[in-house]
């Protein structure tokens, strides 16, 4: 029975976590932000979009931070090839002993692998402190067509926020420039061992636009502007442009009384183009 459809809620995932932690001889590390998924229904929140991707022909994936393999092993039942990158070499060694041949477990830094991966699909129950860095690495890597990410709920709100909303931020601009983002599910703290103190959200990303080098400057300007998100955009952007050594474009004053949080991602791209000359 697939993990997402088990009536007992936990069962397979919890048993797997116990087995892998036992093989590795370790306890969860606060320093590494380790929280292991032990609820089968929660695993199903990740599996559903992975199954959809597989049905569309996307069958090779990179997993960042497989941990004890709660998502890895059931995902291997629907995908042809998974490279799972784990920072903790003890976990990587233990998981590799249980993983099928189609799963290659390696030790390494997930952000670096996200930026360089050849796989069209990436999935991760992300360490919360690395979520924004992972998203940015995926955005820059045009080979990545889709991603399924578990992130802190507040981060998910920023990833899916639209201009004019309270959660709209530099991260929102980054995601919107290249991805279509959807909130696919919510996982409660009790689905993890040990329990985190926050909700986790599952976010799906689908690439809608290739990354351009111009976007780096657009995000630099957005990062500067959102430090004063409630101020008049024209004044804030003028200071940000001058700090970047760029002349403000003539249309800047046409923003009127608009605030920074009202600007569209395309506005920042337009500023970057003006800055380029």
Curated annotation (Swiss-Prot):
<keyword id="KW-0808">Transferase</keyword>
<dbReference type="GO" id="GO:0000179">
    <property type="term" value="F:rRNA (adenine-N6,N6-)-dimethyltransferase activity"/>
</dbReference>
<keyword id="KW-0694">RNA-binding</keyword>
<feature type="binding site">
    <location>
        <position position="109"/>
    </location>
    <ligand>
        <name>S-adenosyl-L-methionine</name>
    </ligand>
</feature>
<dbReference type="InterPro" id="IPR011530">
    <property type="entry name" value="rRNA_adenine_dimethylase"/>
</dbReference>
<comment type="similarity">
    <text>Belongs to the class I-like SAM-binding methyltransferase superfamily. rRNA adenine N(6)-methyltransferase family. RsmA subfamily.</text>
</comment>
<keyword id="KW-0963">Cytoplasm</keyword>
<feature type="binding site">
    <location>
        <position position="65"/>
    </location>
    <ligand>
        <name>S-adenosyl-L-methionine</name>
    </ligand>
</feature>
<dbReference type="InterPro" id="IPR020598">
    <property type="entry name" value="rRNA_Ade_methylase_Trfase_N"/>
</dbReference>
<dbReference type="InterPro" id="IPR029063">
    <property type="entry name" value="SAM-dependent_MTases_sf"/>
</dbReference>
<protein>
    <recommendedName>
        <fullName>Probable ribosomal RNA small subunit methyltransferase A</fullName>
        <ecNumber>2.1.1.-</ecNumber>
    </recommendedName>
</protein>
<dbReference type="Pfam" id="PF00398">
    <property type="entry name" value="RrnaAD"/>
</dbReference>
<feature type="binding site">
    <location>
        <position position="125"/>
    </location>
    <ligand>
        <name>S-adenosyl-L-methionine</name>
    </ligand>
</feature>
<dbReference type="GO" id="GO:0005737">
    <property type="term" value="C:cytoplasm"/>
</dbReference>
<keyword id="KW-0698">rRNA processing</keyword>
<feature type="binding site">
    <location>
        <position position="37"/>
    </location>
    <ligand>
        <name>S-adenosyl-L-methionine</name>
    </ligand>
</feature>
<feature type="binding site">
    <location>
        <position position="35"/>
    </location>
    <ligand>
        <name>S-adenosyl-L-methionine</name>
    </ligand>
</feature>
<keyword id="KW-0949">S-adenosyl-L-methionine</keyword>
<comment type="function">
    <text>Specifically dimethylates two adjacent adenosines in the loop of a conserved hairpin near the 3'-end of 16S rRNA in the 30S particle. May play a critical role in biogenesis of 30S subunits.</text>
</comment>
<dbReference type="GO" id="GO:0003723">
    <property type="term" value="F:RNA binding"/>
</dbReference>
<feature type="binding site">
    <location>
        <position position="86"/>
    </location>
    <ligand>
        <name>S-adenosyl-L-methionine</name>
    </ligand>
</feature>
<dbReference type="InterPro" id="IPR001737">
    <property type="entry name" value="KsgA/Erm"/>
</dbReference>
<keyword id="KW-0489">Methyltransferase</keyword>
């Amino acid at each position: 029975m697939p993990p997402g459809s088990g009536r007992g809620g936990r069962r397979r995932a919890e048993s797997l976590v116990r087995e892998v932690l036992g093989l590795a001889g370790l306890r969860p590390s606060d320093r590494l932000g380790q929280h292991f998924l032990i609820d089968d229904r929660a695993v199903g929140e990740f599996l559903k979009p992975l199954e959809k991707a597989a049905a569309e022909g996307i069958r090779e994936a990179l997993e960042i931070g497989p941990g004890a393999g709660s998502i890895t092993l059931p995902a291997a039942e629907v995908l042809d090839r998974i490279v799972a990158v784990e920072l903790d070499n003890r976990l990587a060694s233990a998981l590799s002993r249980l993983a099928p041949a189609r799963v290659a477990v390696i030790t390494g830094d997930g952000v670096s692998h996200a930026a360089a991966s050849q796989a069209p699909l990436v999935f991760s129950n992300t360490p919360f402190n690395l979520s924004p860095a992972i998203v940015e690495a995926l955005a820059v890597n045009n080979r990545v067509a889709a991603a399924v990410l578990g992130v802190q709920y507040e981060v998910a709100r920023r990833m899916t926020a639209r201009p004019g909303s309270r959660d709209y931020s530099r991260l929102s601009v980054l995601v919107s420039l290249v991805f279509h983002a959807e909130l696919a599910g919510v996982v409660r703290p009790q689905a993890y061992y040990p329990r985190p103190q926050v909700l986790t959200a599952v976010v799906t990303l689908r690439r809608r636009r290739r990354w351009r080098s111009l976007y780096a400057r657009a995000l630099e300007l957005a990062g500067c502007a959102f430090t004063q998100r409630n101020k008049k955009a024209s004044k804030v952007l003028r200071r940000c442009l001058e700090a970047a050594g760029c002349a403000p474009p003539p249309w800047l004053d046409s923003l009127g009384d608009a605030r920074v949080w009202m600007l569209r991602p395309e506005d920042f791209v337009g500023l970057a183009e003006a800055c380029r000359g």
